[in-house]
């Protein structure tokens, strides 16, 4: 929200204007899209790479009029950030990174969320670390820092270096998005353990994949998405694509998993262009341009990936449930 409104704020010397276009992958989340639309900007949707579920950077050249990119690091994974950064620089564009599901992921030793003009993070309870609610936005320049600092607190200049000690001096528009001291303390205490939690999630992911592939009934029922080869991922969840020859079993099977204690979710919201809210805004697009995004919706789901070590009993329970798909 703050990053989006900062991009169009008149206080920012170089900024976007109402009507400017921005690129966003069709597999996205509502809070990645709607703040930019609320700023008067126009979305230009782009398909995803079926191997990573993230924005397909090879399609960027087709979006020649866009002034910004909202790049989403899905479930801890990433596009090729060097290619995206080079494209952004060559076109003098803005880049926002939605890093809400990828806290701690690194692309060639550089943290996701630090490539763009702004990086956004979520500390909701289901994420890598949690403060219960809220999140974080990072930026690169003093101008952007002071703008974000003011906008998060009603548009005050309170707390800024340029402040004239007037507690009620409103220098801009703004919101009330300040964290509580209590939630900040909870988040900071977990931040110290982030690297260990990332390692634990990776081990759990590897355990599940190996257990499934070595199951006596394994017959490539699922496809696991690929970590970008230049990425050291901080995994958010455990996504799967059901193979096409058994796709007709998906609905009944997911109902079975949920009723058995294995909670499932769509991969983000699937192809967001199918959401009812998009019809309200009459977005123009060709379905044939989003075949991978539709495949992610049709075949995909994900389950939780715990930070605590998965013991043998839980691992056996989970894999046995997942391997029952062909019985439906």
PLM regions: where:
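Active-site phosphate-binding strand-loop segment of PLP-dependent enzymes
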Residues: 50-131, 136-144, 302
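Conserved coil-to-alpha-helix start sites within the AMP-binding
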Residues: 27-33
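Structured binding elements
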Residues: 40
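Short beta->alpha connector loops at strand-helix junctions that form conserved
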Residues: 26, 44-49
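Hydrophobic/aromatic ligand-binding patch that stacks against planar heteroaromatic rings
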Residues: 35-36, 87, 182
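Phosphate-binding glycine-rich loop
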Residues: 1-21, 35-37, 45-47, 110
